[in-house]
């Protein structure tokens, strides 16, 4: 199967492309570096994907395309025959989405609608969408299952765009019963490929916990602010479901494996997480252990909308996709630290 991967140069994208190639799929990668660092070679190829080519020994074709640019996207579809789409491209910083809601609604929805329209026009019927645990809002129950309430109390435009896109894809799937739509609700991806050649290289100050912690550990940032230590959790700090990015990437491969094996599956929704929650302090302590570095912390006030605990029940993905997260906390942190120490300046080094 030939797969178009949008947002392919980023953290999740590069790891997903690697797992697709290792599983016998072929890919075309597109990205416009809205989130990923725009580090390219003299030919305009993404450094992250060049490293994927190095790791797999396979060709990784790449085009610098903004999915919001309908004409550029149409050119991609008119020149290639795709069997399926993995749609990862989106603006993704929760805090920024609150400050710039229109930018998020415009970018994330227009990009996705353009892509769906091209799929309809060029008869591409298999669509795997990068969704998020944010669609659940503050959890009404723990662990969160795929049947848990969605769309209520979502505290930021980023999460709203993911929820809206889910609804649009569910409706498109109903109207086009020959389509296969898989909505993958990610929890908190961390870690990096074992080689240390690819990993998370955020623009500016990291928005996510673990890249921030690792940059404090290596000395790029002075101190970690923990937002709240009075939650009803094991140590007062927020608990989340952290999943190794390689395990997450394999979930996308399993989605296409299921489509290949079963045929017409309609629309299916899966949580991709470990089912185990770790607190901020537990994550910091684990990285301290693997790095041997001190990680200074200070306590700040909780951010608006922060909840005590979020973790999922991943058993549906285990049952139907034959997928489970295999990597434990210490290994996640060791792989992150390996990436950070080998690439202290990210892909810019």
From Swiss-Prot:
Cofactor names: NAD(+)
Tell me which residues bind NAD(+).
10-12, 31-35, 66-67, 92, 162, 186
Its pathway, per UniProt, is: Carbohydrate metabolism; galactose metabolism
A GO molecular-function annotation: UDP-N-acetylglucosamine 4-epimerase activity
Tissue distribution of the protein? Expressed in gonads, vulva, intestine, hypdermis and nervous system.
User: What is this protein's function per UniProt?
Assistant: Catalyzes two distinct but analogous reactions: the reversible epimerization of UDP-glucose to UDP-galactose and the reversible epimerization of UDP-N-acetylglucosamine to UDP-N-acetylgalactosamine. The reaction with UDP-Gal plays a critical role in the Leloir pathway of galactose catabolism in which galactose is converted to the glycolytic intermediate glucose 6-phosphate. It contributes to the catabolism of dietary galactose and enables the endogenous biosynthesis of both UDP-Gal and UDP-GalNAc when exogenous sources are limited.
- Indicate yes or no for the key word NAD: yes
Protein name per UniProt: UDP-glucose 4-epimerase
**Which CDD domains does the UniProt record give?**
UDP_G4E_1_SDR_e (cd05247)
Task: Identify the residues that bind substrate.
Answer: 132-134, 186-188, 207-209, 225-227, 240, 303-306
Locate the transmembrane regions by residue number: none
Under Pfam families, the record lists: Epimerase
- What enzyme category does the UniProt record give? isomerase
Q: Which UniProt keywords apply?
A: Carbohydrate metabolism, Galactose metabolism, Isomerase, NAD
Active site (catalytic residues): 158
Gene coding for it:
gale-1
**Cellular-component GO terms for this entry:** cytosol
The protein's superkingdom reads Eukaryota
Q: Is Methyltransferase found in the keyword set?
A: no
* UniProt family annotation: Belongs to the NAD(P)-dependent epimerase/dehydratase family.
């Amino acid at each position: 199967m030939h797969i178009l991967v949008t947002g392919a140069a980023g953290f999740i994208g590069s790891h997903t492309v690697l797992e697709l190639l290792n599983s016998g799929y072929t890919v075309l990668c597109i990205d416009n570096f809205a989130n990923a660092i725009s580090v390219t070679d003299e030919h305009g190829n993404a450094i992250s994907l060049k490293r994927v080519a190095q790791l797999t020994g396979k060709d990784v074709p790449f085009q610098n395309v903004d999915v919001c640019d309908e004409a550029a996207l149409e050119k991609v579809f008119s020149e290639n025959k795709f069997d399926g789409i993995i749609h990862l491209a989106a603006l993704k910083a929760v805090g920024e989405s609150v400050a710039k809601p229109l930018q998020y609604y415009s970018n994330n929805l227009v990009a996705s609608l353009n892509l769906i329209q091209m799929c309809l026009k060029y008869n591409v019927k298999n669509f795997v969408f990068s969704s998020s645990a944010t669609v659940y809002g503050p959890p009404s129950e723990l662990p969160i299952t795929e049947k848990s309430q969605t769309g209520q109390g979502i505290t930021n435009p980023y999460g709203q765009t993911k929820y809206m896109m889910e609804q649009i894809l569910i409706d498109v799937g109903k109207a086009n019963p020959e389509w296969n739509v898989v909505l993958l609700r990610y929890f908190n991806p961390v870690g990096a490929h074992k080689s240390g050649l690819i990993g998370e290289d955020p623009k500016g100050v990291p928005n996510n916990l673990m890249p921030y912690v690792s940059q404090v550990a290596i000395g790029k940032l002075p101190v970690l602010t923990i937002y709240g230590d009075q939650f009803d959790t094991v140590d007062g700090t927020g608990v989340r479901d952290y999943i190794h990015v390689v395990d997450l990437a394999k979930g996308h491969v399993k989605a296409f494996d299921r489509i290949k094996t079963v045929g017409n599956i309609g629309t299916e929704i899966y949580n991709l997480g470990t089912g185990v929650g770790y607190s901020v302090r537990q994550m910091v302590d684990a990285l301290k252990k693997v790095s041997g570095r001190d990680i200074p912390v200070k306590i700040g006030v909780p951010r608006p909308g922060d909840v005590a605990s979020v973790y999922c029940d991943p058993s549906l993905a285990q049952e139907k996709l034959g997928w489970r997260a295999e990597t434990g906390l210490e290994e996640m942190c060791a792989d992150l630290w390996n990436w950070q120490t080998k690439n202290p300046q990210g892909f810019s080094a």
